[in-house]
A protein has these predicted regions:
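N-terminal glycine-rich flavin-associated loop
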Residues: 8, 32-64, 68, 86-133, ...
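Intrinsic disorder at enzyme termini
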Residues: 510-550
Length: 550
């Protein structure tokens, strides 16, 4: 579109840029992909966002490629924050964080979680669905991807903490989205305007396919694929909650401009048991036994992650500073000596919390005693305070950043990075997925949320080579088929984006995929919001935009 920059500059109060530096920055996120936009816009207000949506809707028929994609920190691993038209940078100005009021707090989507959390902790509260990228992600990305993390085992995902949203829909107006009872829903559907018709059409779609939609819900503890229609309308409670659909829609149904989160009390005391597993033979039973003790968090990472953490030890200086890094090194010495006697196949982190340190210590000790019969006790380290286990938490939380920033000859290729399998199947599943990794000669680390069976497998590849890129599709197909054969999900946290959007139909089947397409049409008939994700994603398009240079 000619003069796009000038038209947008005259329209909004925010910034509009088409500088080479800004376009390059916005052309990629943390995924495999690179798409150069026409312009990058930084709105200064929700009114600016509404004007942008209205502008694109008005000119879409004349300029079919015109569209909008929201972006904040650019940490999306699925390619959800890239677009060849207009990138809307929410992270520059829309960063206001309100005050805690009871068990809730309101914030704009561009706020970093690292700035958001201290405000809640001052009141003894926490929004617990933060991902491992908590230091670099924004709350808007958490909502749009329906993020989860180490505390999701106990508390659930971001969709469980969204109380209310301000959303700009395709007509360019801003609407409040929150749970409605049946009387409120009926009144909404009777309005006869854009909003009323949206609610009416969505309600009728869900009602007409109620049983099919409910049965389509993935049988796993966490999921970020498709559209979560099964959580929107419940006949028994007669609650219609559109926030459950917007959370995880990856910006394909509208633009979130304000969020009201629910909060939980933050833990007073924590303690972690670190387990070094010599082998994975009894992993399934160990997981079942651990879950009986109801830990707050149950994480794990493999021997490749552990070895890389030692090899790239100086990376931690950026996170911890020189003194912190040296302290970490001293703490790691005993473990380094243990590793000389044999690298564990997996490191488990089992965290408990409680009202007193005595309660936590007892729970950690009981967990250790329950696992002692498995014969791994020589490699146990019991941690009765969080500080002692901090070194392992750093390895777990920083694992992707270590790979992304510090392995020079290869690049992170997150394409099988977020699969979920019911935990009872992990002893069979993990060796099988490692066979596929080895078959395609991929160097890959495995880390994840053991209690949810949610694993982040991150291959390191020379992705600029055609021979390496040719591995992506067949390897992904094999892993996807394996995951689905165990009743799993293709994404627990990172969402669909460019990388998994093409496989939604494979996961849900043609009928449910057709219902998803109807949802997209109800909200965004002209496809102005974040194209090539979810229902209009194709592998052909994704493949054309794999990043060539890093």
């Amino acid at each position: 579109m000619q003069d796009l920059k000038q038209q947008l500059e005259s329209l909004i109060d925010g910034d509009v840029s088409d500088s080479q530096e800004e376009l390059e920055r916005a052309s990629h996120d943390a995924s495999l992909f690179e798409i150069v936009p026409e312009v990058v816009v930084a709105p200064k207000s929700a009114e600016d966002v509404a004007k942008l949506v209205e502008f694109v809707a008005k000119h879409k028929s004349e300029h079919p490629n015109l569209s909008l994609t929201a972006r904040s920190a650019g940490t999306c691993m699925s390619g959800g924050a890239v677009n060849e038209s207009i990138i809307v940078d929410m992270n520059k100005y829309l960063t206001d964080i309100g005050e805690v009021e009871g068990d809730e707090i309101t914030t704009q989507p561009g706020a970093f979680y690292r700035d958001f959390e201290p405000k809640t902790l001052k009141h003894g509260k926490l929004m617990p669905s933060y991902p491992a990228s908590r230091e670099i992600c924004t709350v808007g990305g958490m909502v749009n991807n329906n993020s989860g993390g180490e505390k999701s085992l106990e508390y659930g995902k971001t969709e469980d903490f969204v109380r209310e949203l301000e959303v700009v829909f395709a007509d360019g107006n801003t609407y409040t989205v929150k749970p409605l009872n049946k009387q409120e829903l009926d009144a909404k559907m009777a309005q006869g305007d854009f909003e009323g018709n949206l609610y009416k059409e969505l309600y009728e779609l869900i009602e007409a396919n109620y049983d099919a939609i409910k049965s389509a819900k993935p049988n796993v503890s966490k999921d970020s694929t498709g559209y979560h229609l099964w959580n929107v309308w419940d006949r028994e409670t007669e609650v219609f909650d559109l926030t459950k659909l917007i959370a995880g829609a990856q910006g394909t149904l509208g633009f979130v401009t304000n969020i009201r989160f629910g909060l939980v009390p933050s833990a007073t005391h924590k303690g972690t048991l670190v387990v070094f597993l010599r082998d994975l033979d009894d992993l399934g039973q160990i997981i079942n036994d651990v879950l009986k003790h109801k830990p707050a968090t149950f994480e794990g990472f493999d021997n490749y992650t552990l070895m890389l953490s030692f090899k790239l030890f100086f990376f931690f200086r950026k996170t911890l500073g020189w003194w912190g890094m040296m302290k970490l090194g001293l703490q790691l010495l005993p473990d380094a000596f243990k590793l000389m006697r044999g690298i564990p196949k997996m490191v488990l982190l089992i965290e408990f919390d409680g009202e007193t340190q005595e309660e936590v210590s007892e729970r950690v000790h009981n967990m250790r005693e329950a696992l002692r019969p498995y014969g791994h006790e020589a490699l146990f380290e019991e941690n009765e305070t969080e500080a002692k286990s901090r070194k392992f938490w750093i390895m777990r939380r920083q694992s992707f950043q270590i790979l992304r920033k510090k392995v020079k000859d290869k690049h992170t290729a997150p394409f099988i990075d977020d699969l979920v399998v019911p935990p009872e199947h992990l002893p069979e599943f993990l060796p099988e997925v490692r066979e596929i990794i080895n078959k395609y000669e991929l160097l890959a680390t495995i880390a994840g949320h053991m209690g949810d069976g949610n694993f982040h497998i991150i291959p390191l590849m020379e992705i600029e080579k055609q021979s390496e890129r040719d591995k992506l599709e067949p390897a992904m197909k094999e892993v996807n088929e394996l995951v689905l054969s165990y009743g799993g999900s293709l994404s627990g946290e990172h969402n669909d984006g460019l990388i998994r959007g093409p496989w939604i139909k494979q996961m849900y089947g043609a009928d449910m995929f057709g219902i998803f397409k109807e949802v997209k049409h109800i909200f965004d008939a002209d496809n102005i919001f974040n194209p090539h994700k979810k229902t209009d994603a194709t592998w052909e398009y994704a493949k054309e935009h794999i990043r060539q240079e890093f």
